[in-house]
A protein has these predicted regions:
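Short Pro-Gly-centered beta-turn/loop motif in secreted/extracellular proteins
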Residues: 386-408, 495, 626-629
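Hydrophobic/aromatic-rich core segments of domains that either
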Residues: 33-41, 53-56, 192-211, 221-331
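Short amphipathic beta-strand segments in non-cytosolic proteins
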Residues: 364-382, 463-468, 472-478, 602
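Structured interaction patches on ligand/partner-binding surfaces of diverse proteins
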Residues: 406-434, 518, 647-657
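Bacterial Sec-dependent N-terminal signal peptides
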Residues: 1-33
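A short, amphipathic beta-strand motif
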Residues: 349-359, 444
Length: 657
């Protein structure tokens, strides 16, 4: 997930603060509607027409729904419908451009040309009575007469179907009517022919989603600055992120009266970024998550979660209170139209933690997790007496740290980092230690499933050496580990001599290798030429060609197969003596790599304090003396890459967080 700037807070923060200061009298009743009518200014008559319309009709449920929308409307802003001209320009680009770099350049150019014509209006001052009445009537028709929302109570209806927009800043257009027949799949036939599917919102959502499954976007973060809300345009995008697919899919689902919400986590607790997905409210009134355009289930299976929020029409009360007070809200939580649904997804605990005993601590308290590079706030908390803070519904198996947002718009630590374990126990991690120990580190990141799933192809492998290019008199001088997963390592003291070296698989299966680096007996790195066997596993895939095995990039790899089928060779130009071979298997590039610069730091309570910086050598290890024991450490690569996870090193054991 990327944090999308164009709908944070739904409009520029300075305008929010100016507006909501006027709304400090908001409570929870008809006074809210009166305040909204005052803020509507010259558009007040349009809103009063809506209220009068339902009073005359004596439809008091629709009147109550209208009051709900009007009560929170001062917070809402929308792109004007003129944005459709921008969408048309994007469509023109998509018709002729699909290559990634050309696509990015064209999208940037079109947006820059259109940006000056894009306008964001206040809903309360621009919405028409006809539009609002039409949207309310259509939503009620879906609820009262439709097939997939009859089980909703009024509050659920207000959250899932009633709103005239699905996401902040969405233009006030005819999305509900326009999209009703788009991607319907077989929902009507299934409902008609099978009793089990009658009124089944989950089945309907899955069916509609399956009909969109061909619209697969390749991932790129390039689109995060572009306000594309029109589903017909989004479905054509060759590249995008999870938010683009969600923006399109939620409109398509709700246009058919299917109660679908947009849920998100602001930050994975053990990865970079966060994530957006959808959930459907089933007949049992429980939400079922799913990924737009993806027919596979298990969207969050085995995922650790710190916080999950659901997008709503009305703003979150606590975030709104902080905005009204002029408090700084961290960028990760600036989408204020949400409610906390963490407990729907995982076991969650209310946790009271101690804060530092010195220094000024404000009431603007948050809880943060680490995003590979820095601490990211994922929820707000309540400052308590006795230098403590209370945080609600925190997911387990997560490293947290309490922070405050200052007037300088920065987040700073106000307490010890702590780990909330699988049983709900809190363990504080010290920020200093009298105990010291020497450390030896080979990686800066734990091994996750996306690497391990290839384990069958990243084991084994052998090196043969010969004086002849046809390897007719070759001998095996190195065998790589096959009984354990070793992503990188060194084979030393090989004492092998020859001009040609062949890398091949240990058996008939595949063996993927990213880099092989050879050293002579003086420890000097050798630079052999490449001998290709003439074939490759996937010749059209640039990441596993033979040339990838000596391109000095641990993120590309060569795929060997069979003992004499697909292999790669090296020509040293003359007979040499090889004393060591460093190897890097197909992986995530997070093992130490020769020539790259790395730094090791420890968390001192307020910042990462540098311990040492080195340039990695053929040992592939970061050795540091007298490192504080039991504190949080962070190993980062200064040459390339962004992935680093905090860890504790104790007695040679590493605990990753």
């Amino acid at each position: 997930m990327m944090r999308i700037d164009y709908f944070k807070l739904s409009f520029e923060k300075c305008l929010i603060v100016m507006m909501v200061i006027m709304m400090t009298s908001f409570s929870c009743g008809r006074d809210d509607v009166k305040t909204s009518l005052k803020l509507a200014s010259q558009n007040r008559c349009e809103l009063e027409k809506v209220l009068s319309h339902y009073k005359i009709e004596r439809d008091y449920e629709k009147l109550k729904a209208a009051e709900f929308l009007i009560k929170y409307m001062p917070w809402q802003r929308s792109y004007s419908v003129d944005i459709s001209n921008y969408y048309d320009a994007v469509d023109s680009v998509l018709a002729v451009t699909s290559e990634r770099d050309a696509f990015k350049s064209a999208m940037k150019r079109v947006y820059e040309e259109s940006e000056k014509h894009l306008r964001i209006d206040s809903d309360i001052q621009t919405i028409t009575a006809d539009y609002l009445i039409s949207e309310i009537d259509a939503a009620f028709n879906q609820w009262r007469n439709g097939k997939w929302a009859r089980h909703l109570d009024f509050d659920e209806f207000c959250n899932y179907l009633l709103p005239y927009k699905c996401i902040a800043n969405q233009p006030l257009d005819d999305w509900r009517e326009r999209l009703s027949n788009l991607a319907r799949g077989d929902i009507d036939r299934r409902e008609r022919e099978c009793k089990d599917y009658q009124y089944d919102s989950k089945s309907a959502a899955i069916s509609v989603n399956a009909s969109m499954s061909g619209n697969y976007m390749k991932y790129t973060k390039q689109l995060e600055q572009y306000p594309i809300f029109r589903p017909e345009t989004i479905l054509k995008l060759p590249y995008g992120t999870c938010i683009e697919s969600c923006i399109a899919a939620i409109q398509i689902q709700r246009s058919k009266g299917i109660p679908v919400s947009l849920d998100f986590t602001p930050q994975w607790p053990n990865r970079k970024y966060g994530h957006y997905w959808l959930s459907v409210l089933g007949l049992n009134h429980k939400s079922v998550p799913f990924v737009p355009f993806d027919i596979e289930s298990g969207v969050l299976e085995n995922r650790i979660l710190s916080k999950v929020f659901r997008m709503t029409y009305n703003p979150n009360r606590e975030l709104a209170r902080r905005v009204r007070k002029g408090l700084r809200i961290p960028s990760s939580l600036e989408y204020i139209f949400c409610q906390d649904v963490t407990a729907e997804y995982t076991t969650a605990d209310d946790v009271e933690v101690k804060l530092f005993s010195n220094g000024r601590i404000s009431d603007n308290i948050y809880i943060a997790t680490f995003n590979n590079q820095t601490w990211i706030p994922v929820d707000w908390g309540e400052k308590k007496g006795g230098r403590k803070a209370l945080f609600h519904a925190l997911g387990r198996n997560v490293l947290y740290m309490p922070v405050q947002c200052t007037e300088m718009h920065e987040c700073e630590s106000v307490g010890y980092p702590f780990f909330l374990d699988s049983r709900g126990n809190v363990t504080y991690i010290p920020i200093c230690s009298d105990n010291k120990e020497d450390v030896c580190l080979y990686r800066k990141y734990p091994v996750y499933a996306f690497v391990y799933k290839n384990s069958a192809m990243i084991r084994g492998g052998v090196l043969d050496i010969s004086d002849k290019s046809d390897f007719s008199n070759s001998t095996t001088f190195a065998v790589f580990p096959s009984d354990s997963l070793t992503l990188a390592g060194a084979v030393s003291s090989v004492d092998a001599a020859g001009r040609f070296v062949k890398f091949k698989s240990s058996n008939e299966g595949r063996c993927d290798m990213a880099e092989l680096i050879f050293y002579n007996e003086e420890g000097v790195r050798l630079s052999p030429a490449l001998i290709k066997c003439g074939r490759e596993v996937h010749p059209n895939n640039k990441v596993n060609l033979a040339t990838a095995i000596n391109d000095d990039d641990p993120l590309t790899f060569f795929s060997a197969r069979g003992e004499d089928d697909i292999w790669v060779g090296f020509d040293f130009g003359k007979k040499v003596k090889v004393s060591q071979v460093d190897y890097f298997r197909r992986s995530d590039g997070n093992n130490l790599y020769p020539g790259y610069e790395y730094s090791l730091a420890w968390w001192n309570g307020y910042t990462w304090e540098l311990i040492d910086t080195i340039t990695a050598d053929k040992s592939l290890c970061f050795n540091a003396k007298q490192v504080p024991s039991g504190v949080l450490l962070l190993l980062t690569c200064l040459t390339t890459g962004t992935e680093s996870r905090p860890f504790v090193y104790n007695g040679g054991n590493i605990i990753w967080y």
